[in-house]
Amino acid sequence: MMVDLFSSLDGMTSLWSWLTPMFLSVFMIWNKTWSMDQNNIIKYLAASNWNNSTYNLTKSLLTIMMVLIIFNNLLGMAPFTYGITTSLWVNMTLALLLWGLILLSGYIKSPKKSLAHLAPSGAPLLLLPFLILIESISIMIRPLTLTVRLVANMSAGHIILALMASVLSSNLSNTSLSLSYLIMVGYYLFEFFVCFIQAYIFTLLLSLYMNEHP
């Protein structure tokens, strides 16, 4: 039972809210048809979505990440389930892991080129320390921006849906009930669109960070 608007963001509301996404995830992983075809599907998506017929590990990783986020976003839209993409800790862990791997890989492969990104070419010598500081801060807050963007957008959608459901359930005898339901269905479809857009933005930002890799 949802006691307030923020109950949908609490993963401890019930065991069912955790079991449903976990069961569906395990089913997708162990399903024989999916297991046989997933490699070809990932290769096709990586080639078609990134405008290149060649298959490489980076594009495959980005495609898998986008599919994973979309899958969990859509699971969170199901009634009485907990969407892990609304969890600050889950998203922060994911963002820190990916950002850290990109950063660490760059410094291991070519420390000089990685450090060169901190100092814009042609910058005045007097402004160089200040520019290096700004660039360092912008790099350090990247996991935070990835996390906040995804959590805020998905959580706001769940809260608004809970608010609309609460209003509808308290006005069942209202003459404008059909209009209210129509508005809620329209917003629900909009939230499905947001699920895809947020996954795309998260992956797009990761690809931009990877482009800075030496």
Curated annotation (Swiss-Prot):
Residue stretches spanning the membrane: 9-29, 64-84, 88-108, 121-141, 150-170, 182-202
UniProt gene name: ATP6
Record CDD domains: ATP-synt_Fo_a_6
Keyword Mitochondrion listed: yes
Species lineage: Eukaryota, Metazoa, Spiralia, Lophotrochozoa, Mollusca
Gene3D superfamilies according to UniProt: ATP synthase, F0 complex, subunit A (1.20.120.220)
Any GO molecular function: proton-transporting ATP synthase activity, rotational mechanism
Statement: the UniProt record of this protein carries the keyword GTP-binding: no
One Pfam family named in its UniProt record: ATP-synt_A
Location within or outside the cell: Mitochondrion inner membrane
Coiled coil: none
Principal localisation: mitochondrion
Function: Mitochondrial membrane ATP synthase (F(1)F(0) ATP synthase or Complex V) produces ATP from ADP in the presence of a proton gradient across the membrane which is generated by electron transport complexes of the respiratory chain. F-type ATPases consist of two structural domains, F(1) - containing the extramembraneous catalytic core and F(0) - containing the membrane proton channel, linked together by a central stalk and a peripheral stalk. During catalysis, ATP synthesis in the catalytic domain of F(1) is coupled via a rotary mechanism of the central stalk subunits to proton translocation.
Summary of subunit composition and partner proteins: F-type ATPases have 2 components, CF(1) - the catalytic core - and CF(0) - the membrane proton channel. CF(1) has five subunits: alpha(3), beta(3), gamma(1), delta(1), epsilon(1). CF(0) has three main subunits: a, b and c.
Gene Ontology CC: one annotated term: proton-transporting ATP synthase complex
Family to which this protein belongs: Belongs to the ATPase A chain family.
Membrane topology: Multi-pass membrane protein
Name this polypeptide is given: ATP synthase subunit a
Keywords annotated in UniProt: ATP synthesis, CF(0), Hydrogen ion transport, Ion transport, Membrane, Mitochondrion, Mitochondrion inner membrane, Transmembrane, Transmembrane helix, Transport
